[in-house]
């Protein structure tokens, strides 16, 4: 209904305003650290990496899950969730110049059970597609952190504290691997003549 669409529009604008307030209305290119936002161009399906422009608007576009939030119009195009074409944007991080890419895999895994009904089949198919895309990107990361959040659905906001706790546990468990990788990078840098 029209009321539902307006509610989603308001939620999206609230996110945009919140992000812009957090960055003091600085555009992406003026942020202190290199930053990029990945979104999907709805008309073409192309991955778009925003490295300039309105920070809040780009984050809103990247967060616009189809069917949950309306697409965000930027310039001539409409944008939706970047996870559709790039679930784990390792390549975007590399393009920014990252020497070490630490990825976090929170993708849903296929359960091994046959889905029920047409909607179940569609959902399972989308999950498989996202999982395969994500695996390709995760393979290009230096370290992958995998919090145990598979039992928590993407819309189960009441379990956010549990999800955060699982993320913290997984990050702490990955620290030795991260430190080892940093050590390897430092050795390579020292060995390269200037």
Give the predicted meaning of each segment.
Residues 1-194:
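Patatin-like phospholipase
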């Amino acid at each position: 209904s029209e009321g539902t669409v307006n509610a989603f529009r308001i939620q999206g604008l609230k996110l945009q305003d919140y992000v812009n307030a957090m960055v003091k209305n600085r555009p992406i290119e003026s942020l202190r650290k290199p930053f990029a936002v990945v979104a999907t161009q709805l008309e073409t399906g192309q991955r778009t990496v925003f490295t300039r422009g309105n920070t809040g608007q780009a984050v809103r576009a990247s967060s616009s899950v189809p069917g949950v939030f309306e697409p965000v119009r930027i310039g001539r195009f409409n944008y939706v969730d970047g996870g559709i074409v790039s679930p784990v944007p390792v390549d975007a991080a590399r393009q920014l110049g990252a020497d070490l890419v630490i990825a976090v895999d929170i993708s849903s895994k296929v359960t091994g059970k046959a889905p029920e009904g047409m909607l179940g089949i569609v959902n399972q198919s989308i999950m498989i597609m996202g999982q395969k895309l994500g695996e390709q990107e995760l393979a290009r990361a230096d370290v992958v952190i995998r919090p145990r959040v598979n039992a928590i659905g993407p819309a189960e906001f009441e379990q956010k504290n549990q999800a955060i706790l699982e993320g913290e546990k997984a990050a702490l468990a990955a620290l030795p691997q991260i430190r080892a990788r940093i050590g390897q990078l430092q050795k390579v840098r020292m060995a390269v003549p200037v």
